[in-house]
């Protein structure tokens, strides 16, 4: 009985960790450097910048720690 409870708790913990690893933050930035600073401050491992309209950039920060 105790081993089943421990296994269930481990499975729940692993699901929570996977969800946190895939956390995504978006923000509007002025340029790529601003985007890089924003993602770094959130503790993100990856970033992607895309230009929405000429002066505006959208920053996608991927795999962030909370």
Swiss-Prot record:
Expressed by the venom gland. Keywords: Disulfide bond, Ion channel impairing toxin, Neurotoxin, Potassium channel impairing toxin, Secreted, Signal, Toxin. Belongs to the short scorpion toxin superfamily. Potassium channel inhibitor family. Residues 1-21 form the signal peptide. Disulfide bonds join 29-49, 35-59, 39-61, 44-64. It comes from Hoffmannihadrurus gertschi (Scorpion). GO terms for cellular component: extracellular region. It is found in: Secreted. This is Potassium channel toxin alpha-KTx. GO terms for molecular function: potassium channel regulator activity; toxin activity. Its main location: secreted. Blocks voltage-gated potassium channels.
